[in-house]
């Protein structure tokens, strides 16, 4: 994947924060947490995983609000921890994409009760939109 990560400064220059992203991979905003010292810049043909839309959060490099990377069926993000449990729609998309890649014409995933996960997602999205 055409991208470059540089690490300027020291550990004190880390980008650490919660964030909300808009991503073409999910119908709902994606909530996540980042903690990284690198500054990543995407090359030609590589798109962002999403764009930071909250007042908190830094993205790949603290310059352009782009977060993560997408290239073909590869997804990368600085969001970690509980990314997938807090974003069940994104999780379903990634699982379905993998199944479709492995099994041509894979059946759609059967819906699960995502009530708890969606509640966690809503809570974080509301918290981050009000507190920045």
Locate each region found by the language model.
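Short, flexible turn/loop "capping" segments at secondary-structure junctions
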Residues: 68-72
């Amino acid at each position: 994947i055409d991208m470059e990560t540089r690490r300027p400064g020291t550990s004190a220059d880390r980008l650490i924060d919660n964030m909300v992203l808009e991503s073409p991979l999910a119908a709902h905003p994606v909530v996540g947490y980042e903690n990284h010292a690198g500054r990543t810049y995407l090359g030609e043909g590589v798109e962002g995983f999403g764009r930071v839309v909250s007042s908190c959060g830094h993205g790949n490099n603290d310059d352009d609000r782009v977060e993560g990377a997408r290239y073909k069926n590869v997804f990368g993000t600085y969001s970690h921890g509980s990314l997938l449990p807090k974003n069940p729609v994104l999780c379903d998309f990634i699982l379905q994409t993998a199944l479709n890649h492995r099994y041509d014409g894979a059946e759609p995933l059967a819906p699960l009760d995502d009530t708890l996960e969606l509640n966690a997602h809503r809570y974080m999205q509301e918290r981050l939109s009000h507190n920045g």
